[in-house]
């Protein structure tokens, strides 16, 4: 039996495997709310333009709301033979209101319909993700205030570099997440044009009002070119790109948590709520939540790469290949949502081990730059010369197996006679971080001020 929605040209129905590969209802059912919103806006416009009689408009509107209620109650039956969410909704609408339902698709194609549905879904999801990113920023800023003066090692090449504070480290991620929110907002602004009314690809001969439909759905304007309207998936690609960059940021922090919670580092503790045990090793507390965030970043990046590859060879306008935009986009953006929730939970849960952090901050001659800066300030030494002198002092300490602050003044003066005992004041890690008062530096007062500024900017949690 041919499909009654489009089967007039066909004498028989599709092969079973054709039906299976063609159907998208298994995943695009999550567009049900957006599909019904689009149909309600479309039928209202058809009525206001005099294209449909008022009684048909009223019947269709009531029927669509009934379908929406059935879906919300879990009573709606999604059937594979109906292919997709558009035909599933229309089929049930026909059962409810009769032949009038067939008028709903006037001046519309599934091509512009699905493009509209996807834009609505991505827009809704970007708004939700933005709120989640803000919540993670808030958690990080709160931690930064609390630990503005908690000294820890700063790393380059995963080698001790210079002391920083735990709060300063948290604020680095607040800044990254701020850029992520900017990218989400940019993507949202560009996607906020309405394809509905572009029809299959060429527009329609009916006197529709696309501006009214766009306004009813909260879009800024209708899309300007009917071919581009149905051929475009830039909005999904751009959103996946922004999601991928955000996921990379989360993955970097997750990697640090995995390392920091290890017995070899012991920088932070996570509670039982964010760790799991081993089936054979009773002592284990594994940071599985952080590891899964790290893994899901790859999954999100994979969705972006996959859709880029799908789109790269498609001629205008619509091809069935574009049905493959949905699963990856749905999965990636929902995976990011899960990662954001997990990271916010871990940030609020984690407990820095201050003594371990402080001890590690002083290892690896991390205050060597402070010594070089002291030589520049106090002895008026060119920095390149100070760098060389400091390197020789570090070598002397390393040969003795001691820290810089443990090296005797006599040993330092053997390298540079002008060094005085005043140098020891800059070799402690607290003094080191306190001295970094330049804008954006790790001085505790800077960190506290910036963290409080972020909390003010972010505002309270929205209920």
Curated annotation (Swiss-Prot):
Keywords for this protein: Amino-acid biosynthesis, Arginine biosynthesis, Cytoplasm, Lyase
Cellular compartment(s): Cytoplasm
PROSITE patterns: FUMARATE_LYASES
Biological pathway: Amino-acid biosynthesis; L-arginine biosynthesis; L-arginine from L-ornithine and carbamoyl phosphate: step 3/3
Reactions performed catalytically: 2-(N(omega)-L-arginino)succinate = fumarate + L-arginine
UniProt-listed HAMAP family: Arg_succ_lyase
Family membership noted in the UniProt record: Belongs to the lyase 1 family. Argininosuccinate lyase subfamily.
Record-given protein name: Argininosuccinate lyase
């Amino acid at each position: 039996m041919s499909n009654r929605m489009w089967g007039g040209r066909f004498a028989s129905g599709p092969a079973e495997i054709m039906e299976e590969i063609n159907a998208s209802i298994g995943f695009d059912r999550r567009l049900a709310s957006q599909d019904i919103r689009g149909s309600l806006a479309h039928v209202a416009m058809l009525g206001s333009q005099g294209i449909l009689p008022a009684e048909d408009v009223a019947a269709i509107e009531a029927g669509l709301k009934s379908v929406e209620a059935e879906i919300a109650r879990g009573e709606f039956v999604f059937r594979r033979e109906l292919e997709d969410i558009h035909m599933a909704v229309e089929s049930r609408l026909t059962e409810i209101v009769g032949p009038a339902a067939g008028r709903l698709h006037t001046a519309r194609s599934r091509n512009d319909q699905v493009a509209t549905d996807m834009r609505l879904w991505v827009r809704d999801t970007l708004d939700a993700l933005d709120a989640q990113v803000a919540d993670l920023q808030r958690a990080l800023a709160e931690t930064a205030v609390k630990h503005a003066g908690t000294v820890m090692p700063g790393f380059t090449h995963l080698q001790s570099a210079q002391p920083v504070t735990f709060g300063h480290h948290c604020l680095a991620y607040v800044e990254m997440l701020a850029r992520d929110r900017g990218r989400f907002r940019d993507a949202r602004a560009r996607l906020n044009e309405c394809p509905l009314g572009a029809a299959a690809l060429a527009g329609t001969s009916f006197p529709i009002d696309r501006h009214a439909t766009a306004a009813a759905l909260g879009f800024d304007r209708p899309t300007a070119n009917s071919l581009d309207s149905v051929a475009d998936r830039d909005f999904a690609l751009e959103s996946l790109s922004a999601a991928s960059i955000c996921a990379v940021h989360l993955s970097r922090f997750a990697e640090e948590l995995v390392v920091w919670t290890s017995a070899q580092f012991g920088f932070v503790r996570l509670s039982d709520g964010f760790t799991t045990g081993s089936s054979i090793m009773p002592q284990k507390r594994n940071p599985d939540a952080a590891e899964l965030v790290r893994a899901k970043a790859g999954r999100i990046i994979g969705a972006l790469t996959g859709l880029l590859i799908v789109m790269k060879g498609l001629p205008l306008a619509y091809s069935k290949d574009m049905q493959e935009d949905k699963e990856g986009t749905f999965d990636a953006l929902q995976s990011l949502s899960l990662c954001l929730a997990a990271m916010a939970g871990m940030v609020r849960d984690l407990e820095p081990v201050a003594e371990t952090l402080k001890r590690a901050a002083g290892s690896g001659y991390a205050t060597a730059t402070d010594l070089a800066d002291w030589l520049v300030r106090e002895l008026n030494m060119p920095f390149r010369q100070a760098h060389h002198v400091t390197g020789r002092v570090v070598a002397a300490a390393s040969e003795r197996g001691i820290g810089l602050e443990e090296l005797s003044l006599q040993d330092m003066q053997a390298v540079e006679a002008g060094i005085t005992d005043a140098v020891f004041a800059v070799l402690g890690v607290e003094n080191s971080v306190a001295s970094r008062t330049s804008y954006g530096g790790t001085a505790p007062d800077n960190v506290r001020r910036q963290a409080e500024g972020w909390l003010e900017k972010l505002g309270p949690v929205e209920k």
